[in-house]
């Protein structure tokens, strides 16, 4: 079992910022179209983080042209170029599935204030 942990540790990303459910992220995703490759930004609210180690994943939700779009990313995949935390959200749940049913201002998440010091 220790051998598997060593193999997993070699594959983990080191440039992952600290984020949790309720935070707004910019996820820079590499998209391959034919023989060309470009970077596409997916901006949305993290509604969940699941798993652990190499199998850890997170789901980001955004509303695009009135349609809710959710995308689940493995955290340690090479497809992700970088992750930026735009704002920190103040929520009391680890899974924010209730946002799927909310519209407009009701779906807005309060910003978490960091203590000075």
Swiss-Prot record:
The keyword Secreted does not apply. One of its GO terms (cellular component) is cytosolic large ribosomal subunit. GO terms for molecular function: structural constituent of ribosome. GO terms for biological process: translation. The keyword Ribonucleoprotein applies. Keywords: Ribonucleoprotein, Ribosomal protein. Belongs to the bacterial ribosomal protein bL19 family. This protein is located at the 30S-50S ribosomal subunit interface and may play a role in the structure and function of the aminoacyl-tRNA binding site. This is Large ribosomal subunit protein bL19. It comes from Kineococcus radiotolerans (strain ATCC BAA-149 / DSM 14245 / SRS30216). The lineage of its organism: Bacteria, Bacillati, Actinomycetota, Actinomycetes, Kineosporiales.
